[in-house]
Amino acid sequence: MASKQYEEALQKANLSDMAERYDDMAKEMRLAVTLAHEDKHILNVMARNLFSVAYKNLVSSRRSSWRMLCSERQKLEGKDPSVVHVINEKIKVVEEELLRFCDEVLDIITTYILSLEEAQKNIEYNIFFLKMKGDYYRYKAEVVTGPEHSEVSKHAAESYKEATEKAKTLPPTNPIKLGLALNYSVFHYEILNDSEKACSIAKGAFDEAIKELDTLSEEHYRDSTLIMQLLRDNLTLWTSREEGNVMGDEGKGDPDEN
């Protein structure tokens, strides 16, 4: 019965994705993850991607809203206190929603997804979700301040570092490994303000992958080359900033979060 419910939950989540009903999609994937955990089996590639897409869309829209509102507040600060007050109220609502979704993802990954013995044995699966943990702690770090910022940044760093250690066994062109390097470098640049380390991670991943591009399988070619392009774009942007030539745009994370 659980298996039938699981398949039905995935079907519903897939339809919700097509209909862009991401709240429904997240709810359906929470059920699918719970059922998979009860049966002690890990999510297949389709299921883990559905889980990722559901929360990516819920969180990405809030991140965009938060940035837009903060930008608007900056323009009006010192000019119109009453409007700034309204903007602050709206920012608070968006932050609460964003943090709630992040905490939801982190709890699901820790409690259900990575707690299974099989999950620890599957290296790519393990790295995929450790990276995801790092990403969602990073999203929290974008909006929280003070001691909480330090705490979530520390958790993000630990998740990315653990994933990076495990990813050493994967080929340099593996898209999960490349996506991890991309997001870990963005974390160093945007959260830790360490441009040197960010560039080092991005350049190292790009250079290693370029050396083995000829061995890249057709299955992974599109994903891997896309992430390599994003690594190169970030390197160009970051080095230009260091030279004082460019201002503005943020570094690009992997395609799952754009």
Curated annotation (Swiss-Prot):
The lineage of its organism: Eukaryota, Fungi, Fungi incertae sedis, Microsporidia, Unikaryonidae. This is 14-3-3 protein homolog. It comes from the Eukaryota. InterPro entries: 14-3-3, 14-3-3_dom_sf, 14-3-3_domain. Belongs to the 14-3-3 family. Transmembrane segments: none annotated. Pfam families: 14-3-3.
